Amino acid sequence: MKRVIAVSDSHGRVERLRDVLFAVLGMAHTDVAVFLGDGCRDWDDIYMDVARAFPGLHLYCVKGNNDSYVSYSDLIQFKVGAANFIACHGHRHGVKMNLDRLEIEAVSAEAQVALYGHTHIASITNYFNCLFVNPGSIAGWGSFAPVAAEILVDDKGQVSARHITADEVGL
């Protein structure tokens, strides 16, 4: 079983991002961690600490609408086990309106999982045999608010996802 963690939208809250990531990554072995934008400088500030603490962890970042000053891509594709992933912030795909443009991107990439942020609203939706996962904002709103998303990929490439709350990781 492979494990992917997605977080998003730190908006300058570097310590909160660090606390969330270390708590969530410390729960179980993780293969990939993805930051979905709007705080890429925060990501850069903690990147080496995370890489040192979790050797072998693959770390990815995409830029959001508030990250124009960084050189990260708007959208990335990667594979975890037998599952194809795409990841973006979502502002260029109009995710605050609907997921239509992101669906087209996911179908084109033959993705089983599409990760996005931007809305600050945690959600997991299944369209066209693809999981569309928004982890919400790491800022959270109360102890039961989602701060991350966990995506599991089994040996056959089947995927499942859930949200992890601040309360669950003691934050």
What is each model feature region?
Residues 1-54, 67-74, 145-147, 171:
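N-terminal active-site segment of His-dependent metallophosphoesterases
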Residues 1-5, 77-86, 126-132, 153-163:
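Beta-strand-turn-beta hairpins that frame and shape the catalytic cleft
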Residues 99-109:
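Non-DNA-binding regulatory cores of transcription-related proteins
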Residues 108-111, 126, 133-171:
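Binuclear metal-dependent phosphoesterase catalytic core
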